[in-house]
């Protein structure tokens, strides 16, 4: 999973 302030999208994390 991603850090709580990041969001998952198409298999990676973004801010």
UniProtKB/Swiss-Prot annotation:
Disulfide bonds join 2-13. Residues 1-15 form the C-type lectin domain. The keyword Disulfide bond applies. It comes from the Eukaryota. One of its GO terms (cellular component) is extracellular region. One of its GO terms (molecular function) is toxin activity. Expressed by the venom gland. It is found in: Secreted. The keyword Metal-binding does not apply. Keywords: Disulfide bond, Hemostasis impairing toxin, Secreted, Toxin. Interferes with one step of hemostasis (modulation of platelet aggregation, or coagulation cascade, for example). Belongs to the snaclec family. This is Snaclec Bfon18. It comes from Bothrops fonsecai (Fonseca's lancehead). The lineage of its organism: Eukaryota, Metazoa, Chordata, Craniata, Vertebrata.
């Amino acid at each position: 999973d991603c850090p709580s302030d990041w969001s998952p999208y198409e298999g990676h994390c973004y801010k």
